[in-house]
Amino acid sequence: MASTRVLASRLASQMAASAKVARPAVRVAQVSKRTIQTGSPLQTLKRTQMTSIVNATTRQAFQKRAYSSEIAQAMVEVSKNLGMGSAAIGLTGAGIGIGLVFAALLNGVARNPALRGQLFSYAILGFAFVEAIGLFDLMVALMAKFT
């Protein structure tokens, strides 16, 4: 609590001393008041130490951390790669689906060779649906990586 009061009063006095809108008479009065007061060397040392601590604290409070952007960028890249990998797992499902469609075609033609043309057209239609799902999954995976 006391450190907050010290920080606030110190910042206010620094702003008043460095403000361009302050009248020169006010600044002279503040400077002369400080120069007239004399204290022991210990008090002067404490005052300069406190000023340096306050300045360091305010600098640290408003300073941007150098490593935060690098960590954030690395986390974004890891997330993109995980998203692409997770979405690419769906491509194996499309490959399995295409294999099952043509396995069913071969099984159907083996059971009833007379329906070969009709079964082949249904197999091509099933292949197109499964491939569309696979391409959609690939598109999602690439969007997760490159956007």
From Swiss-Prot:
UniProt keyword annotation of Transit peptide present: yes
GO MF annotation terms: lipid binding; proton transmembrane transporter activity
Regions that span the bilayer: 86-106, 123-143
Biological processes, Gene Ontology terms: proton motive force-driven ATP synthesis
Bilayer disposition of the protein: Multi-pass membrane protein
Annotated organelle transit peptide span: 1-66
Top-rank taxon: Eukaryota
CDD domains: ATP-synt_Fo_c_ATP5G3
Effect of F127S: In oligomycin-resistant mutant
Quaternary organization: F-type ATPases have 2 components, CF(1) - the catalytic core - and CF(0) - the membrane proton channel. CF(1) has five subunits: alpha(3), beta(3), gamma(1), delta(1), epsilon(1). CF(0) has three main subunits: a, b and c.
Known function: Mitochondrial membrane ATP synthase (F(1)F(0) ATP synthase or Complex V) produces ATP from ADP in the presence of a proton gradient across the membrane which is generated by electron transport complexes of the respiratory chain. F-type ATPases consist of two structural domains, F(1) - containing the extramembraneous catalytic core and F(0) - containing the membrane proton channel, linked together by a central stalk and a peripheral stalk. During catalysis, ATP synthesis in the catalytic domain of F(1) is coupled via a rotary mechanism of the central stalk subunits to proton translocation.
Entry similarity comment: Belongs to the ATPase C chain family.
Name of this chain's protein: ATP synthase subunit 9, mitochondrial
